[in-house]
């Protein structure tokens, strides 16, 4: 019986669509969406997103809808089992991480503790 392989980190169709829109504005289809974790925020760690031109040695690259999400090995340790999404509301529009490893998150969802 074949079971689909679960990725250590995934991203939603909404995140892929928004990222496609961002790289179209950059006029550079080689850009990747990099998600990483750094110290800070009100809970000790915060999620960061940037457009990147390269995949570094050891990075995990996940492709969907013709775009790539990349994450470094250290950050991946905090993000395993997570899902990167893009949400829009009256208050904000942003990429978020649904992180199964987070013990607590701040009200805005951009920082967490483990």
UniProtKB/Swiss-Prot annotation:
Iron-sulfur cluster binds at residues 42, 106, 108. One of its GO terms (cellular component) is cytosol. One of its GO terms (molecular function) is iron ion binding. Homodimer. InterPro entries: FeS_biogenesis (IPR000361), FeS_cluster_insertion (IPR016092), FeS_cluster_insertion_RrpA (IPR023063), HesB-like_dom_sf (IPR035903). NCBIfam families: iron-sulfur cluster assembly accessory protein (TIGR00049), PRK13623.1 (NF010147). Binds 1 iron-sulfur cluster per subunit. Belongs to the HesB/IscA family. It comes from Hamiltonella defensa subsp. Acyrthosiphon pisum (strain 5AT). Its cofactor is iron-sulfur cluster. This is Iron-sulfur cluster insertion protein ErpA. It holds the Pfam family Fe-S_biosyn. Keywords: Iron, Iron-sulfur, Metal-binding. It comes from the Bacteria. One of its GO terms (biological process) is iron-sulfur cluster assembly. Required for insertion of 4Fe-4S clusters for at least IspG.
